């Protein structure tokens, strides 16, 4: 009953290109929303105003969020996991990580990914190939985050070993 109300609120917030998975099983007395996007805090606050269940947040990355959903630990998991071989987001991961799990996929957000560099880009960083240079150091995301998966896939496609990238192991 309140599960459909929750889905209606999620549908109101959707419309662009972000994936949210909601189990179709009956939601009991709590809803746990998993992911690292700030929009999820807004969603949790909105749901707390509109449904009888308690809405909680879990701040796991995309991969770990889908795993938590498969383990039955969360009701909603967001993902932005790029699949390099198909050049697509999320669906390949969802189908392989949630076998036999009924989910509803909603697209909530679209965002741009890129490198943050010092003002003026003094080192002229333009591509992943530049990350191999000795004068360039990165700050990485934790394993399982959507950004980390994207970086890992882009490095793989460029034939760059992670050991060649200064800072790769530092999160």
How would you name each of these model-derived features?
Residues 1-64, 70-73, 81, 92, ...:
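N-terminal hydrophobic or amphipathic helices and topogenic motifs
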Residues 26-36, 129-148:
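Short loop->beta-strand "edge-of-pocket" segments that line small-molecule binding or catalytic clefts
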Residues 42-51, 128-129, 134, 147-169:
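Ligand-binding cleft/hinge of the Venus flytrap
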Residues 58-67, 163-171:
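Short helix-initiation/N-cap motifs at beta->coil->alpha
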Residues 81-82, 142:
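Short secondary-structure boundary segments
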Residues 97-116:
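Short Pro/Gly-enriched coil loops immediately N-terminal to beta-strands
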Residues 108, 117-137:
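Flexible hinge/capping segments at coil-to-helix
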């Amino acid at each position: 009953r309140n599960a459909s109300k929750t889905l209606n609120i999620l549908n109101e917030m959707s419309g662009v290109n972000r994936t949210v998975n909601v189990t179709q099983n009956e939601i009991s007395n709590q809803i746990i929303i998993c992911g690292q996007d700030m929009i999820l805090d807004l969603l949790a606050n909105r749901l707390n105003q509109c449904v009888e269940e308690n809405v909680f947040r879990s701040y796991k990355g995309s991969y770990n969020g889908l795993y938590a959903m498969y383990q039955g630990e969360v009701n909603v998991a967001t993902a932005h996991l790029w699949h390099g071989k198909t050049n697509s987001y999320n669906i390949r991961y969802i189908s392989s990580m949630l076998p036999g799990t009924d989910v509803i996929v909603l697209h909530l957000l679209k965002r741009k990914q890129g490198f943050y560099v010092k003002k003026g880009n003094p080192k002229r960083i333009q591509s992943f190939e530049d990350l191999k240079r000795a004068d360039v150091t990165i700050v990485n995301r934790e394993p399982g985050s959507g950004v980390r998966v994207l970086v890992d896939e882009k490095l793989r496609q460029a034939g760059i070993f992670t050991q060649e990238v200064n800072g790769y192991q530092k999160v």
